């Protein structure tokens, strides 16, 4: 399931665009996630009060968390599949503290793909979308393995 060098290049090319505005992209991803899958909002005590898209757009905390999420994902993507060291603490916190099911990681992956396509259509065509989907699938597969090692079957 690994990615070719060319696929990783497509992923990292568009990620360069994301890094120019991590907080903005992250906020858009979280808004898309919460609007598309409102049940995911229940995992975030500090965001539960955000009921409308306007509330979410006005939230500096949501923007900060979006930045945190995409910073962590960027560090993982840049490892081109050799992300064990980056994945371990993330799996630990998401399995034992936050109890985030793998299904929710699928939901946020869909949100990431949607946001990247809407914000960067020229750089995120079909090939880049397929490569990013593959990279996010690899991430989910590997984090699911770590979850099982930790005894979490979410």
Curated annotation (Swiss-Prot):
Pfam families: Globin. One of its GO terms (cellular component) is sarcoplasm. One of its GO terms (molecular function) is oxygen binding. Residues 2-148 form the Globin domain. Disulfide bonds: none annotated. It is found in: Cytoplasm, Sarcoplasm. Heme b binds at residue 94. O2 binds at residue 65. Its main location: cytoplasm. PROSITE patterns: GLOBIN (PS01033). The keyword Transport applies. Its EC number is 1.7.-.-, 1.11.1.-. Keywords: Cytoplasm, Heme, Iron, Metal-binding, Muscle protein, Oxidoreductase, Oxygen transport, Transport. Belongs to the globin family. PANTHER family: MYOGLOBIN. Monomeric. This is Myoglobin-2. It comes from Stenella attenuata. The gene is MB2.
């Amino acid at each position: 399931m690994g990615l070719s060098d060319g696929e990783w290049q497509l992923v990292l090319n568009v990620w360069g665009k994301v890094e120019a505005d991590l907080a903005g992209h992250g906020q858009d991803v979280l808004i898309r996630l919460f609007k598309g899958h409102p049940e995911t909002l229940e995992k975030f005590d500090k965001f539960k009060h955000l009921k409308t898209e306007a509330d979410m757009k006005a939230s500096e905390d949501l923007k900060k968390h979006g930045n945190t999420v995409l910073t962590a994902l960027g560090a993982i993507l840049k490892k081109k599949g050799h992300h064990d060291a980056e994945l371990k603490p993330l799996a630990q916190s998401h399995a034992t503290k936050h109890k985030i099911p793998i299904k929710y990681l699928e939901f946020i992956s869909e949100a990431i793909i949607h946001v990247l396509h809407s914000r960067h259509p020229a750089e995120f065509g079909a090939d880049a979308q397929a490569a990013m989907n593959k990279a996010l699938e690899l991430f989910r597969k590997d984090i699911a393995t770590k979850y099982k090692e930790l005894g979490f079957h979410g």
